């Protein structure tokens, strides 16, 4: 199998996934998954698509990710891995889609408006 490319995005994070046959090594920005993400919960979030199709130790994954924070990056990586797995084998698609791993979360931070403190919060109103 050749290398499969996929892209995942979430908020301002962009993850580029390079998936190939292997022993289950996952490296993010040339470091191991466990070193890159501090929390065990985030690591399990990244591995969810592989656990869903029971292929934890079948593919080597190299990931380049930039932008955002840990959570946004992890969700971008999860989407990218799910998309790459669908390219490898289209029969994975129904189970991944059912769990919602193929849905791009389109929510972004709302921009700050002038005359307001934040996106929607106004300055304190003084009647007199």
Swiss-Prot record:
The family database entries (InterPro entries) matched by this protein are listed as: Ribosomal_Su5_D2-typ_SF, Ribosomal_uS9, Ribosomal_uS9_bac/plastid, Ribosomal_uS9_CS, Ribsml_uS5_D2-typ_fold_subgr
* Keywords noted in UniProt: Ribonucleoprotein, Ribosomal protein
A GO BP term here is: translation
Can you list the GO cellular component terms from the UniProt entry? cytosolic small ribosomal subunit
The record's listing under SUPFAM superfamilies reads: Ribosomal protein S5 domain 2-like
Question: Which superkingdom is the protein from?
Answer: Bacteria
Molecular function terms, GO-annotated: RNA binding; structural constituent of ribosome
- Check the record and name the PROSITE patterns matching this protein: RIBOSOMAL_S9
Claim: DNA-binding is one of the keywords in the record: no
Q: Which family does it belong to?
A: Belongs to the universal ribosomal protein uS9 family.
* PANTHER family linked: RIBOSOMAL PROTEIN S9, SMALL RIBOSOMAL SUBUNIT PROTEIN US9M
Q: What is this protein called?
A: Small ribosomal subunit protein uS9
Question: Which organism is this entry from?
Answer: Amoebophilus asiaticus (strain 5a2)
């Amino acid at each position: 199998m050749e290398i499969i490319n996929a892209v995942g995005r979430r908020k301002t994070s962009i993850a580029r996934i390079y998936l190939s046959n292997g022993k289950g090594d996952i490296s993010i920005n040339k470091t191991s998954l466990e070193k890159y993400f501090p929390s065990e919960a985030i690591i399990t979030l990244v591995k969810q698509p592989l656990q869903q199709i029971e292929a934890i130790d079948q593919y080597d994954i190299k990931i380049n990710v930039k932008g955002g924070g840990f959570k946004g990056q992890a969700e971008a990586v999860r989407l990218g891995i799910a998309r790459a797995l669908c390219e490898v084998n289209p029969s994975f698609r129904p189970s991944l889609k059912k769990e919602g791993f193929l849905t791009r979360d389109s929510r972004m931070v709302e921009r700050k408006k002038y005359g307001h403190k934040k996106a929607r919060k106004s300055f304190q109103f003084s009647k007199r």
